[in-house]
């Protein structure tokens, strides 16, 4: 998945990852291929609910224009369903959802201004 992103993205402002061992290992693959201005490992993303994740996102500073979140299910899948117009059963491990928010501030994110741009599963790239 990291190699797939190289063709699409060369830099992301902020990598925000759960502090679990598994997500730390996953993040290393992305860090080896993509430039991040800031990286944070956060206990609050460990098994957090969609509502908790959305609250965390809404508290990002506006210096970040692009953010990558590495977290856990079912919270991550539920978050995607909550803020987009899709009904996803499960975002698989290392699955990617690219979402655009048409708003000026992170705390203004809502379903009404969110657009799912891309949804990629690892098995699609094999």
What are these regions (language model features)?
Residues 60-63, 73-94:
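Non-DNA-binding regulatory cores of transcription-related proteins
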Residues 1-44, 48, 90-91, 126:
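Active-site-proximal alpha-helix that buttresses catalytic centers in soluble enzyme cores
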Residues 87-117:
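Domain-level recognition of soluble alpha/beta enzyme cores
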Residues 1-11, 33, 63-64, 77, ...:
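An N-terminal RHG(E/S)-centered segment typical of histidine phosphatases
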Residues 45-57:
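Short alpha-helix plus adjacent loop in nuclease-associated cores
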Residues 16, 65-71:
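Beta-strand elements within well-structured catalytic alpha/beta cores of enzymes
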Residues 26-30, 53, 79-80:
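Hydrophobic packing residues within well-ordered alpha-helices of enzyme cores
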């Amino acid at each position: 998945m990291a190699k797939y992103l190289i063709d699409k993205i060369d830099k992301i402002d902020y990598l925000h990852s759960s502090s679990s061992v598994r997500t730390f290992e996953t993040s290393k693959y992305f860090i080896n291929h993509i430039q991040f201005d800031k990286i944070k490992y956060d206990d609050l993303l460990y098994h957090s609910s969609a509502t908790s994740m959305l609250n965390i996102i809404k508290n990002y500073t506006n210096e970040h224009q692009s953010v990558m979140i590495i977290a856990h299910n079912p919270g991550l899948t539920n978050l995607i369903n909550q803020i987009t117009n899709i009904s996803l059963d499960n975002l698989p491990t290392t699955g990617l959802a690219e979402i655009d928010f048409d708003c000026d501030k992170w705390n203004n994110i809502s379903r009404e201004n969110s657009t799912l741009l891309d949804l990629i599963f690892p098995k699609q790239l094999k």
